[in-house]
A protein has these predicted regions:
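Negatively charged, low-complexity tracts enriched in Asp/Glu with abundant Ser/Thr
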Residues: 1-30, 69-113, 152-166
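Intrinsically disordered, low-complexity regulatory segments enriched in Ser/Thr/Pro
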Residues: 45-86, 126-164
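Compositionally biased, intrinsically disordered low-complexity regions
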Residues: 8, 29, 41, 46, ...
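Short acidic DE-rich linear segments
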Residues: 168-175
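Amphipathic, interaction-prone secondary-structure segments
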Residues: 17-51, 104-134
């Protein structure tokens, strides 16, 4: 994992959160993500809407996207700017799901410290294949998360962001 300019630290959490937000905006489903030397390759299903009367429901097509390092840095900047505005994400079925799911998976990966990642999602469940750093890094490890696991991780995520503030604590700043 590379360090992205402006990122407070080298982390999968923020990178995947940004990619997930982009995928939510596109309405992409059933995601496959693989790390490449210069970024990430993502495949998923997208429903394309047609004006044809015989195609009222739209057509599901498989799309492949390549996110280069510069794209990821831009997505991260856009996500940070968007967060403070309080605007709801565009309606795309489960809009916002991939942003939050990818974020908690990224946090899990940050704890594992892999040097290479691959994962896929189907119906909200994820299978990860990680190549660990260090001397034991000569074999991939697998991790599986059900939709319920992801929901639980998302629910717990706010408690992991910042240490709880102490009420009534006095500051000694400036002394």
């Amino acid at each position: 994992m590379r360090i992205y300019e402006g990122s407070p630290r080298e982390d999968f959490e923020e990178v995947f959160r940004s990619i997930g937000a982009f995928l939510d905006q596109r309405g992409m489903k059933e995601i496959l993500l693989a790390e490449a030397p210069d970024g990430f390759i993502v495949q998923g299903l997208v429903t394309s809407v047609s004006n044809s009367t015989s195609d009222l429901m739209g057509t599901v097509v498989k799309e492949t996207l390549t996110f280069l390092d510069d794209d990821i840095a831009r997505f991260m900047e856009e996500a940070i700017a968007r967060r403070g505005q309080g605007e709801p994400p565009p309606d795309a079925g489960e809009a916002g799901y991939y942003e939050t799911a990818f974020r908690v998976l990224g946090r899990y990966m940050d704890e594992q410290r892999p040097r290479d990642v691959f994962f896929f999602e189907q119906e909200g469940s994820f299978v990860l294949r990680l190549l660990p750093m260090g001397t034991s890094g000569n074999r991939h490890i697998l991790a599986e998360f059900t939709r319920e696991d992801i929901a639980d991780m998302i629910a717990r995520a706010p408690t992991l962001r910042y240490p709880p503030a102490k009420t009534g604590a006095k500051t000694t700043a400036g002394r």
